[in-house]
A protein has these predicted regions:
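Feature activates predominantly on carbohydrate-active enzymes
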Residues: 24, 94-300, 304-318, 359, ...
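Flexible loop/turn segments at secondary-structure boundaries
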Residues: 55-56, 164-166, 192-198, 267-273, ...
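Active-site neighborhood of glycoside hydrolase catalytic domains
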Residues: 273, 279-283, 287-384, 391-398
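Flexible, acidic glycine-rich loops studded with aromatic residues
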Residues: 370-376, 381-386, 392-537
Length: 686
């Protein structure tokens, strides 16, 4: 007892971490020293608390549920093997201007387990570490732990609009979040897939748009069905959460020290709203735009009514308002929007969006709440008290933090859990990107060391996001979440993370425990990893040669620029990054490689990517041409195919073999009537 209390006081005075490997705990504790022996938990092992009240009642119930033990008020004599939870009345430790209410110590000896903290949240997290140290069902490995998180915000987002997930499923995920010390559940409740929240003032939201005509997202959304229906209609698919169910879920989360943050999308991503209330669009018609009309005052009356009920249900500090991917096209020609721009002295539709966001923020602030939104809320002007969720990359979040805004980092390249986590053609359908466990674990939210002190103050944490366009079932959702959510948990909690191999080993142990708890997951033991061809540079006659683009790549998918197709690096599974180049529209890809001199050719090959979830398809037409002077070309091979190959994902080459002489090698690739992207990595010449 005394040495653990001394360790607590020493940590308050000095926050310099010591790296000691944990046995099997995720996230890795700040300090953990393993020792020999075990504490054996028996059915009659008493648990003592030194505090009372509602928090004590909740703690007792949780201990009964997870450990099956009775809890008592008071202190047992030292000869009785017991588990002791002590709430300390001392000042919280602090660092970078933040206090750490989740700090705890855990001391396990063969005779006693002692958890101490100055908050019940810290005691709760000490219990999670205790649970993870258990082996053989009832033995807890002896250890001494001093622990606290790096960031106060460690979150998971679940999209329940594209596909509806039951309250029971959400509670199961809240249990897993608590086990891995995640403390923010971002609940994506509204979007084009359906409105999921009962709003008593506007009953049509659930009556008209909580259900849709089919569950297949590709057929319903991508093939432009997009019709909503009533719950009793034949084939109706969807659902919604009653206000009583929401209250129950919020309370369930709170007992696990998790804050639920609701997201109500605006001004974009609101197709479903207008099927119920078409007067809120610029044209006053349903199915014409995904955006609210900022020039229409009735829009703000509606949203304030919705948000009033949202705030009554969710006591969270933040209300997430989306703010991403607003189309804005209708605003450019809408008389009401143009009048609003004129009246408010705005420059363009970006500033009109900023006006919209700031007006909503003022309403939330007036009710004691803060606005949180995706990083597009920075377009035009950022609302003065808004917090930013940085998803398009890291720059927006860093910019907002340097300007004194609170930020949650969740860049898609590391934190989007709807993307493939292993070789795509071995995996269930996903959104097309590639975020394996190692990539998620490698994320460093504060990579700019020169301004680390400022960033530490305003970057609140990290979040893993599961969008569910391609995730229709609970089993699929868990498969996408785990184990990558464990990496997010450790990134958010542990300042000095161990090497990936260490984390991977601990994760495999954690997954074995999750299996016993009934979770589905991707089995790391079966992981195949990166594309083999991408690991070794390839040498060929066109390596480093100049490329002239007669039809250029898009800047968004530029690879490394003009040298991408001849840099000797073949693409990995992910279409983003610097290995692939993306082309769209018109002739799509038309590139000429200058070999520098007339050269004898025997083979030309280029890999093309198909990833249907993100509208990338193997080209309908590919042609290889050669020239001696760069003016007059001869076609060596042309491949014309209709888009009959409907596989979700593959990488295949277009290859010519033969004999020819040329200085210039030209490769053309384009799509037919169906359109879509062309992605190519390297044009190899031998």
């Amino acid at each position: 007892m005394h040495r653990t209390f001394l360790a607590l006081l020493l940590l308050v005075a000095s926050l310099c971490p010591k790296q000691v490997q944990a046995q099997s705990v995720i996230p890795q504790p700040r300090e953990i020293t393993m020792s020999k022996g075990f504490f054996t938990i028996k059915p009659n092992t008493p648990v003592e608390l030194n505090f009372e009240g509602e928090e004590a009642r909740q703690m007792k119930a949780y201990i009964r549920q997870t450990l099956g033990l009775k809890v008592f008020k008071g202190k047992f004599i030292s000869k009785v093997p017991a588990i002791s939870l002590n709430l300390l009345r001392i000042k919280e430790p602090s660092c970078y201007g933040r206090t750490f209410p989740e700090y705890y110590t855990l001391d396990v000896t063969p005779e006693r387990i002692t958890i101490m903290s100055h908050t019940t949240t810290g005691l709760f997290y000490g219990l999670q570490t205790l649970r993870q140290l258990m082996v053989d069902g009832n033995k807890v490995a002896c250890a001494e732990v001093n622990d606290q998180p790096r960031f106060p915000y460690r979150g998971m987002m679940l999209d329940c609009s594209r596909h509806f997930f039951t309250p029971q499923f959400i509670k199961k995920q809240l249990d897993a979040m608590a086990y891995f010390k995640l403390n923010r559940f971002h609940w994506h409740l509204t979007d084009g897939g359906g409105w999921r929240l009962e709003v008593k003032k506007y009953p049509k939201l659930i009556e008209e748009t909580a259900y849709r005509t089919q569950n297949d997202w590709t057929k319903w959304w991508r093939e432009h069905d997009r019709r909503y229906c009533h719950a009793n209609d034949s084939g109706a698919y969807g659902g919604y959460y009653t206000q009583d169910e929401v209250r129950d879920l919020v309370a369930y989360a709170a007992k696990r020290h998790i804050t639920v943050i609701p997201e109500i999308e605006m001004p974009g991503h609101s197709n479903e709203v207008f099927a119920a209330y078409p007067n809120l669009t610029c044209e006053g018609k349903a199915y014409t735009s995904p955006d609210f009309c900022p020039g229409n005052d009735s829009v703000f009356t509606f949203l304030e009514g919705v948000l009033t009920e949202v705030m009554q249900l969710f006591p969270s500090e933040y209300i997430h308002i989306g703010g991403d991917e607003a189309w804005q096209e209708k605003w450019k020609t809408c008389p009401k929007c143009q009048q609003r721009i004129k009246d408010e002295g705005l420059k363009d539709t970006h500033e009109l969006q900023a006006y919209f966001i700031m007006r909503i923020e003022k309403f939330l602030n007036g009710h004691g709440r803060k606005l949180l939104g995706w990083d597009e809320i920075m377009q035009g002007r950022l609302a003065p008290n808004a917090a930013v969720m940085s998803w398009t990359g890291e720059e927006a979040g860093l910019k907002a933090a340097k300007a004194g805004h609170h930020v949650v980092m969740t860049p898609g390249a590391y934190c989007y859990l709807d993307m493939y986590q292993d070789v795509p053609f071995t995996q269930p359908k996903a959104m097309g990107g590639y975020v394996p466990l190692e990539k998620a674990y490698s994320y460093e939210p504060i990579a700019h060391k020169e301004s680390a002190d400022t960033l530490e103050k305003f970057i609140d944490g990290v979040q893993g996001n599961l969008w569910t366009e391609e995730v229709p079932t609970p089993e699929h959702a868990e498969y996408m979440l785990y184990p990558r959510l464990l990496a997010i948990a450790e990134v958010g909690w542990t300042r000095n993370r161990p090497p990936y191999d260490n984390f991977r080993h601990r994760t495999i142990q954690a997954l074995d425990r999750m299996k016993a708890m009934g979770y589905n997951f991707f089995d790391l033991r079966n992981e195949r990893g990166r594309r083999e061809e991408s690991l070794t540079p390839v040498t060929h006659l066109a390596l480093g040669k100049t490329v002239t683009y007669l039809s250029r790549y898009t800047e968004k998918y530029r690879g490394t620029g003009d040298g991408t197709l001849t840099d000797g690096r073949r693409g990995d599974w992910v279409f983003k990054g610097d290995r692939w180049q993306g082309f769209i529209g018109g002739e799509c890809m038309d590139a000429v490689i200058d070999l520098g001199a007339e050269t004898e050719l025997h083979e030309v090959s280029a890999d093309f990517l198909q990833s249907m979830g993100v509208d990338i398809a193997f080209p309908d037409s590919v042609e290889l041409l050669v020239s001696a002077d760069g003016q007059n070309y001869t076609s060596l091979q042309r491949r014309d195919v209709e888009r009959h190959d409907k596989r979700e994902y593959f990488i295949e080459p277009f290859t010519w073999k033969g004999t020819a002489k040329a200085r210039y090698v030209r490769l053309r690739a384009k799509q037919g009537a169906e359109g879509g992207w062309v992605f190519c990595d390297e044009v190899k010449v031998w």
